[in-house]
Structures are given as C-alpha cells and as structure tokens.
Amino acid sequence: MRTALAMEWEKLRPVHKTSRTIALAIALAVTVSALVALAVASSASHMSSYDRLTFDSVGISLEGVNAAVLAVAAFGILSITREYATGMMAVTFLAQPGRLRVLGAKLLTHAGVAGLAGAGACVAAFAVGQTLLSTGGLATGWSAPQLPAALGGGVVYLILVCVWGIALGALVRTSAAAIIMSAFLLVVAPILVQILPGSMVQQASRWLPSQIGVQAMSAHHDPYAFAPWTGLAVLGGYVAITLIAGGFRMVRREP
C-alpha cells in the first residue's frame, strides 16, 4: 500500500494541479456566499423580529460551499478518467498489480486534497459571508455554538463528493459521462424535484446529496430533512455503493 500511495502522491505533486483545485473550490464558495450574504443583508431592514430570531447566519454564510462541490467532484472524476483515456492506468496496474490497492491509494490522496480544499472553502466562505451579513446586523461571528459542527460537516461533505467522483470515474471511465452524471445528481435533480406535487417535494429532497450538504452546514435544521450527520451517513451509503460497483469493474475489466 505504501508504494501505491507514493505513486499516487507523485501524480498529485505538480503544484498547479492541486493548487488549482483548492483555489477554484475556494473561489466558487466565496463568490456565491458573498452574493447570497449581500442580497440577504440588503433586505435586513424588512425582516421581522421573528425572522431575525430564526435567521441561520451560519448556513447563509456557508451557502457557497455547495457551489464548490462541482469543482471537487470533477477533481475526483478526472483523477481516474484521465488515466484511462491516456492509457496510464494500464501502466499503473503493471507497476502496482493490486488494482483495489491502487484505487484505495487514489482515494486516500485525493480525499486529503479535498479535505484541504473543503477546509479552505468553508472558512473563507464563512468569513466573507459574516463580514457582509454584519452590515445588516445579521452576523453571529466565530463564537456561534453551531459553527464547529457546520464547518466540519462542510469538510466531510466535500470529501465524500470527491470520493464519489472517483467512484463514478472508476465505474463509467469517461470524463464527460461521469461529469454529466455528477452535475445531474448535484445540480439538476434538486430542480426537477420541485415539480413534484405537495409533500412529495420534501420527502424526495431529503435524499438528495445537495440537500444533505445544506443540512450539514446549517445551524437551524429543516424538520423534514435528515439530521446533519444522519444525512452524511446516507451520502456515505451512496458513495459506498458506487465505489463497490466501480471497484468491481476495475478488477473485472481491462483498462
């Protein structure tokens, strides 16, 4: 396993590859959080006392992290589909015959980068969001009791999305197909769910990865949604199923 980890780390060593992923995730998270916080702060004067009391300052500040998931998912997907496309996967398997060991090493190294990107994105998004929300008197600051759990939930969410991307890449093996699938699950599905009748929207939404991510990073939780860590466990189940399927195909099919 040590050799496989060393090989995967060598592939990640080019600074531009890793730094671009982290920078893009942070940029997306900060930009979207800033826009959302600015819009909310500008309408703060029209909020009632009840609205202010129930306002989720932490969740609004971390709203942009959901935009970073696309960058993190693509990072995971491309880490494996590019190797299949260029023929490097066959070379990797010759150098390291244990295919599941190769997959495990790729998961560990890329999950580490996703964790760094997630931590940077969550902290930066929260800092910017709170700064803008303070103009409307809506900021809670870094002392909010729910903040550690929300930041931790955001990091775990992005790590799971990265691992899911690798699993999709191993299963599908083509960049375009895997990216389209991840975009559908993370972006399009939440929109399509809104056309369902009545209470079915709430029942279906709670199973969506994006809704799970929102709840993991919120201070006030939707009673119809999964609790934060329960939702992350559900997402972990999705990842595990996809990973088993991807690992099976990796072992059974030639690159």
Task: Please describe what each predicted stretch is.
Residues 1-27, 173, 186:
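Aromatic- and glycine-rich beta-strand/loop motifs that create alpha-glucan
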Residues 11, 81, 92-94, 165, ...:
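Helix-capping/transition residues at the boundaries of transmembrane alpha-helices
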Residues 18-77, 103-171, 191-193, 214-237, ...:
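Secretory targeting signals
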Residues 19, 100, 176-177:
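Residues that define the loop-to-transmembrane-helix transition and helix capping
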Residues 31-34, 175-211:
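Transmembrane helix segments
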Residues 39-44, 84, 88, 128, ...:
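Membrane-interfacial segments
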Residues 74-95, 99-100, 107:
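Transmembrane helix boundary and interhelical loop/hinge segments in multi-pass membrane proteins
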Residues 234-255:
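Junction motif at the cytosolic side of a transmembrane helix
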